[in-house]
């Protein structure tokens, strides 16, 4: 696991280099930010890295990164590959990473990666409303995008959750139209988005934080940011809950010494 973490750290360093060069703002997100605050680096059992960017900056990064990334790394997006998740990743091509719900019927790169989540302004609605909405959207997306075998139940699920998904989207569009969007920010709601909002002033202006002995961009107020996500985030979970996401990790398909020959 440690070899995989160090390879992911090198991907993050490359992203940081490109972002600094082109003035693209990003920040550590999710479990990666939690690891930085609580452990000074990776959560010991964590096997991925999460960062966030505003939607505009993520689009700029998507344009620039393919020309800037070092050899052996690739930018993976829903537009470039038929991916399982509709988010952007920087993948390492000399590794193999398999999650329990990986779809081997789809042809996409499955190396170690850094997730890049796009963030947008959110309407000024209550946090409870946003969380209920996010969970409903997440469930609908999950049902609609997993493989179905033909049956009356599957047909019913597609129609029911399809209609519910469209209804939720219309409610969310109405919230954007009727409320100001100057207080909160969060990730674009996708299959793993749960509608957790952050105040803009706890994200911007960005700060820096130490992660594995190096400094990376972080939210302005990591405590408030992590409290939104995890509440009592400094409490280490019991051993039985300290689980990796992957079911199989191969940090190097070809030994690095052979690659350099």
Predicted regions and their residues:
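Conserved catalytic core of two-metal-ion nucleotidyltransferases
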Residues: 1-22, 65-124, 142-149, 153-229, ...
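Active-site nucleotide-donor binding segment shared across nucleotidyl transfer reactions
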Residues: 16-49, 53, 58
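Short, conserved charged micro-motifs
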Residues: 59-63
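A short secondary-structure junction signal
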Residues: 125-132
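A contiguous, mid-domain pocket- or channel-lining segment that forms the substrate-recognition surface
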Residues: 137
